[in-house]
């Protein structure tokens, strides 16, 4: 039996991870969880799974949960803040950590978990975007497996199994194109948060839904793929595939292309990561090839969707430029959702930050966290 912690248990990936645990009740024990504000759902999870440790990152929610746990006689330790996140990620009794928190907050607990020798089921792509060099070095030094949960990176990971890494010609990273595929810049001027949140294929949280609509999500995935698979940026090609059936592909030097196909259901890559190297029973509907009428592929429109282009530029420049890109994007998404900026201002402000801040510094936890704070403060003061 594997013992696990889930960081971000009440979010989209966290709740779907719980679905996997319900399906494999005999295979996993949930030891620790973290959440932010959703105390009602957190209480339901505590009652169902009986985790020993619960970390809450929002102060008022933490106080409320402490009172609820005590009044109902539940046996779990409730911890507050970043200290709590790190504790849940580094518990002696766990084998693997599912990092499904959204954004920069996942970086420190992930790095500390790696240093404690915990395998990582990685759904928090920002961790590799801002500190990929550090994270992969620490993973290698500590003998830790980084198992991708993103459907695209899981597909690449599976397509690499049993093949020589040095025979890769290129990675083909698929994208649905999001809800605004085919739109012009003029079309995007009137985009509202409500429209941007409606993804055509995937059930996701708010932040990743906006990122998918701007193609920034794909840009972050390009940087993530660079670090996960030690692949140069010039050999990572984004392919728009609206049907979301092929989750990504690897082309080898002999011309062969190996792809992973499946229904668009995040429980599949979650299940694969948690059970690796084994494959377990089918948690989702199986792909019926006879129901697929067509599989189509397009090049992304980098002029209209500038975020993807900016992500490639940030990745190529390296050092702390991806930290600037990521921090600026997180704040811009927040401001857009709160209707403080327009949709087209998102790439404009990100590019402004990339041209404003010094990125040519060593990638350390200290430097990443400090620069991230500077970027966020700059945008809040100017645009909020």
Language-model segment annotations:
Residues 1-384:
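Catalytic, metal-anchored helix/loop core of enzyme active sites in primary metabolism
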